Curated annotation (Swiss-Prot):
It catalyses: 2 (2R)-3-phosphoglycerate + 2 H(+) = D-ribulose 1,5-bisphosphate + CO2 + H2O; D-ribulose 1,5-bisphosphate + O2 = 2-phosphoglycolate + (2R)-3-phosphoglycerate + 2 H(+). This is Ribulose bisphosphate carboxylase large chain. NCBIfam families: PRK04208.1. The record marks 324 as: Transition state stabilizer.
């Protein structure tokens, strides 16, 4: 058959409802909003074509390859309940389309081009199924949950953190002082803010030195292992690695990276360096809401979370759930499980479109951070369980007596909640009561409770 020039409907080639997916396929669930007059099958096929082998017209060179082997296929379409003209299009991609061990390449293929397509009014990537064969090409988190607990010698409870505020403007010496006070008071970690890199008021090397000094002083006084997330994010990959090398030379346990603004290539390089040199890696998701906030367009955070587990990170910020809507709680817990567990069953009520097997890829600790304080502690302990980091920035530094008492209040509240839970008490119902009891023998906690009057949780 000779080459037949011209434009034909995508669905003739790329919509294949009879296709049986393979174990090695990467599967994607897209929320598609077609333009008026575009049938859903065509819209689904557009997505499959433009994110794999297709282009707008038939080309002569199609005859030089086996399209059936390499093309993406839209294999199922379902309407979205309660939404007019929205569909979930399921697309299967052959594994050969992707470079091994490259999150960058995976995203460039799947979401690189198709989101600006005229036939679509809006498009959102809701979930990805990463096949075992592809998972195995990634190093993943530098260390993972178990190794981190062993390094820190901390078991049976969530870890406590605090972001140092004001985030910009402190000198390195004053910054280090705040770090020391928080760690001395009982926190496990303190944190550079995501936008603390190396600015005129505080260059990175000075900050690293003063924070390391604070860390060692607090360790000596408390007998506990302490950490400060030193933000190694920089303008170039070379500079980022240089900062990580200096952190390693100081002997600190953990560094930090802003993985979306820094980019997946830089993040994966840093994760490899961290595994090779015994550093834990804390990941901040600055810029995520630009990508994931719109319900009908962009990429859902669960996909960004999966991508981070592949690229590599030991902690990642994942929202707080507290005080949010019920549905959001289930959805958040869905991607928290995707970060921590080895094997996650498909569960649409939690937003999980595919069963995901991570084989032996280490897990990532979810970090709850943003607007939380001591009254939230029972809810956070209940919702996130032991394998999490609870971060109180203002909830530590906003204590009326200062930073160290703020840290004491948080640690006492956490220990009280963990003890109550281990005794079989119901944190959901008795949370406020547990905190009030603990106040009796901790004036620091009592003062914190007074400032942030109790919040009512309807579990």
């Amino acid at each position: 058959v000779g080459f037949k020039a011209g434009v034909k409907d995508y669905k003739l080639t790329y919509y294949t409802p009879d296709y049986e997916t393979k174990d090695t396929d990467i599967l994607a669930a897209f929320r598609v909003t077609p333009q008026p007059g575009v049938p859903p099958e065509e819209a689904g096929a557009v997505v499959a074509a433009e994110s794999s082998t297709g282009t707008w017209t038939t080309v002569w060179t199609d005859g030089l390859t086996n399209l059936d082997r390499y093309k993406g296929r839209c294999y199922h379409i379902e309407p979205v309940a309660g939404e007019e003209n929205q569909f979930i299009a399921y697309v299967a991609y052959p594994l050969d389309l992707f470079e091994e061990g490259s999150v960058t390449n995976m995203f460039t293929s799947i979401v690189g081009n198709v989101f600006g397509f005229k036939a679509l009014r809006a498009l959102r990537l809701e979930d990805l199924r990463i096949p075992v064969a592809y998972v195995k090409t990634f190093q993943g988190p530098p260390h993972g949950i178990q190794v981190e607990r062993d390094k820190l010698n901390k078991y049976g409870r969530p870890l406590l953190g605090c972001t140092i505020k004001p985030k910009l403007g402190l000198s390195a010496k004053n910054y280090g002082r705040a770090v020391y006070e928080c760690l001395r008071g009982g926190l496990d970690f303190t944190k550079d803010d995501e936008n603390v890199n190396s600015q005129p008021f505080m260059r990175w090397r000075d900050r690293f030195l003063f924070c390391a000094e604070a860390l060692y002083k607090a360790q000596a006084e408390t007998g506990e292992i302490k950490g400060h997330y030193l933000n190694a994010t920089a303008g170039t990959c070379e500079e980022m690695i240089k900062r990580a090398v200096f952190a390693r030379e100081l002997g600190v346990p953990i560094v930090m990276h802003d993985y979306l603004t820094g980019g997946f290539t830089a993040n994966t390089s840093l994760a490899h360096y961290c595994r090779d040199n015994g550093l834990l890696l804390h990941i901040h998701r600055a810029m995520h809401a630009v990508i994931d906030r719109q319900k009908n367009h962009g990429i859902h955070f669960r996909v960004l979370a999966k991508a981070l587990r592949m690229s590599g990170g030991d902690h990642i910020h994942s929202g707080t759930v507290v005080g949010k809507l019920e549905g959001e709680r289930e959805i958040t817990l869905g991607f928290v499980d995707l970060l921590r567990d080895d094997f996650i069953e498909k569960d649409r009520s939690r937003g999980i479109y595919f069963t995901q097997d991570w084989v032996s890829l280490p897990g990532v600790l979810p970090v709850a951070s943003g607007g939380i304080h001591v009254w939230h502690m029972p809810a956070l302990t209940e919702i996130f369980g032991d394998d999490s980091v609870l971060q109180f920035g203002g909830g530590t530094l906003g204590h009326p007596w200062g930073n160290a008492p703020g840290a004491v209040a948080n640690r006492v509240a956490l220990e009280a909640c963990v003890q109550a839970r281990n005794e079989g008490r119901d944190l959901a119902r008795e949370g406020n009561e547990i905190i009030r009891e603990a106040c009796k023998w901790s004036p620091e906690l009592a003062a914190a409770c007074e400032v942030w009057k109790e919040i009512k949780f309807e579990f």
